[in-house]
């Protein structure tokens, strides 16, 4: 199974990736993260790197055609999480939390499993 994990370098994503990468049935994990959380240590601590493809990009601008048809399951964790700061940057929050979710939903086909953490 090939996974796409957006926001994979956040707290939940990094823990999840290390658990999933140890499973035999997981062949590849594609991660898209822009390091907005500045959790660089999460990247350094990744295990089973041979299964991981990492894109250090903002999902807003990422061309999902690069990975289309290579994904069996999407775990969508990317979002703007600082509620206090979100009021002063509504357009960015709309892009991150709504438009990116729409992009992810459009990427999947009828057989793609999508897990969305909100």
For each feature predicted by the language model, list its residue ranges.
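N-terminal Rossmann/SDR dinucleotide-binding element
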Residues: 1-73
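Ser/Thr-centric signal marking residues that sit
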Residues: 6, 81, 101, 112
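Conserved active-site helix of classical SDR/Rossmann-fold NAD(P)-dependent CH-OH oxidoreductases
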Residues: 18, 101-102
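NAD(P)H-binding glycine-rich loop region in Rossmannoid oxidoreductase-like domains
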Residues: 59-95
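Conserved Rossmann-fold NAD(P)-dependent oxidoreductase catalytic core, especially the SDR/UDP-sugar
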Residues: 76, 102-118
